[in-house]
Amino acid sequence: MAILKIDAERLWRRIMELSEFTEPNRPWTRLAFGENHRRCREWVRAQMAEAGLSVGVDPGGNMIGTREGRRKGLPAIACGSHSDTVPNGGRFDGAAGLAAAVEIASALADNDVELDHSLEVIDFLAEEPNEFGTSCVGSRAVAGELT
């Protein structure tokens, strides 16, 4: 298979747009379960759909965009990050990884590339510590460690 080229402008646009979901007086604050996080996840869902992914939410609250592979039964290739931040967190914390994962799906779709394995782009729920005293909620759910 030839090396795929990503659309760097689209990737940068997605990173910048995602980073804009923040509290006006607390830059780069997108707390899990808050209004900014809810709106951000709606935007992420739309970006996943635009990239040709079918989007759903697993029992742990993770949003997962899936591009089906040619060979059923093979384990999925998973990539992604999280869309929440700590208060006054880094501008691109989570955003860059999530946007990059969506760009991988977009590049595959743009070039009509089919993989043997399914591709899953995951927005892990509540990875950062939050006001409920929890963190890594989504990834712990995937690992079977959420009790």
State the predicted function of each range.
Residues 2-35:
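N-terminal capping segment at the start of a domain
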Residues 10-23, 40, 55, 68, ...:
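N-terminal glycine-rich anion-binding loops that anchor highly charged ligand groups
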Residues 86, 96-147:
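Acidic/histidine-rich catalytic neighborhood of metal-dependent amide-processing enzymes
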Residues 18, 48, 121:
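Conserved hydrophobic/aromatic pocket- or pore-lining residues that grip, position, or stack substrates
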Residues 51, 59, 63-96, 101:
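Catalytic-core environment of secreted peptidases
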Residues 6, 89-92, 130:
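Alpha-helix capping and helix-loop boundary segments enriched in small/acidic/polar residues
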Residues 7-14, 36, 40-44, 75, ...:
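General structural feature for long, well-ordered alpha-helical segments within catalytic domains
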Residues 25-43, 60-65:
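Short secondary-structure junction/hinge motifs that connect adjacent elements
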